[in-house]
Amino acid sequence: MEQHFTVTTRFAVKTLEKALKLYTPSLREKSLADFLADKCDDLGFRDIHTDDVGNIIATKGSGSPKILLCGHMDTVPGRIRVRKEGDYLFGRGSSDAKGPLIAMLFAAASAQEKTGTVIFVGTVDEEGNATGIKSLTKDKPDVEYAIFGEPSGTNQITIGYKGRIAINLKINVENSAHASAPWLAKNAIHESSLFVNEIKNVLESGQENKKKGMMLTATLTEIKGGLSHNVTPRECDSTLDIRIPVGISCKSVEEKISKAVQEISKKQQVEAFYSIIDETEPFEAEHNSPLVRALTLGILDIEKNRPTLIRKTGTGDMNVIGNSLSIPVVTYGPGDPHAAHTIDEKI
């Protein structure tokens, strides 16, 4: 017998509040996966399971069309006290992206038999190296459309994301010295800063006429070096996060990085090694696909305003499926994208 559910606003908010109280940084999402599995069971989903990497997958409805509703369960590190203030709910992941994920859960639950099939997925590691979506894509899900849950606001549809290359750069110098006589040895941290600045200059040059949102950016995000406060460091590890706009390939960026590291290493006469931590190609969806048109009409019907198509400067799970499967895809969800990753994250 077909089941019908009415989800009240209070119940939806309480469900999100419970999800926010589960601390789920990347690759520590099991508690939320178990929570969602129970909710899916209560809401009449079938084939509820977690895959080999920890993604939660459940199915509702039947027949065609088949659509994937996919959000991520992980958040960036850092706890925020879950609390209500006026019309807002604060908490880590409220905007990015447990809010959109729970919205998708209830949207999928409304699917009725023989009107189409909805595959609901909560992925792991979106904020890390995209382990979840890469595994899901490798399994080639049987879907005709895909919507990814990320904060865009109700009147915006995300059609494009930058790509990403993250590199680890390791600098080794021959010797160390007492901090009171720094001229006796090269300083690995100082050398690392020279490498980072040179690589940044090489990658970011020639973009004077581009808008900021369309520029390639190279950002130093981590640096580790030194054994003692009074000894010059022999080793230094740093991480560079490089965001790549549509129209530039990861391969071309890697070639520039490789050449720059070799040239700087030779000039500075220090050992330098780099490795690729993560690589995701940029992606932009078709602006006039059936999915974009249908979502636009739905927003017009509810909000009485035509939504704006936007490109984001980050990188999302949409990149992976968009570049791998020939199906219409978009990203959409409640929340302010500028609140993501902040100490005042709210929805």
Give each language-model segment a name.
Residues 1-68, 235-239, 253-256:
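N-terminal helical capping/dimerization or prosegment-like subdomains
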Residues 7, 152, 159, 165-347:
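Metal-dependent amide/peptide-bond hydrolase catalytic core
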Residues 18, 106-113, 194-201:
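Short glycine/serine- and small hydrophobic-enriched flexible loop segments
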Residues 23, 40, 58, 69-72, ...:
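Buried hydrophobic positions in well-ordered alpha/beta secondary-structure cores of metabolic enzymes
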Residues 48-49, 89-97, 308-313:
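Active-site nucleophile and cofactor-binding loops and adjacent substrate-binding regions
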Residues 64-122, 343:
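Active-site metal-coordination/substrate-binding segment of hydrolases
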Residues 66-68, 89, 144-148, 166-168, ...:
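Short glycine-aspartate micro-motif
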Residues 98, 102-166:
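Acidic/histidine-rich catalytic neighborhood of metal-dependent amide-processing enzymes
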